[in-house]
């Protein structure tokens, strides 16, 4: 999942840059949305990992 979130962020960055260079506001906005989606996935994954770690520590 971490790879997917990083890929979404990378893809979004590329789209945003290309949109900016070509003055394509729609592509630029799409890139911003992809980056935000990737970041959200990363935050959720990190939270899940922290919760899992906390549960594992409580079990010991």
Swiss-Prot record:
Signal peptide: none annotated. Belongs to the UPF0337 (CsbD) family. Residues 18-41 are annotated as: Disordered. This is UPF0337 protein SAOUHSC_01730. Residues 23-41 have a biased composition (Basic and acidic residues). SUPFAM superfamilies: Hypothetical protein YjbJ. It comes from the Bacteria. It comes from Staphylococcus aureus (strain NCTC 8325 / PS 47).
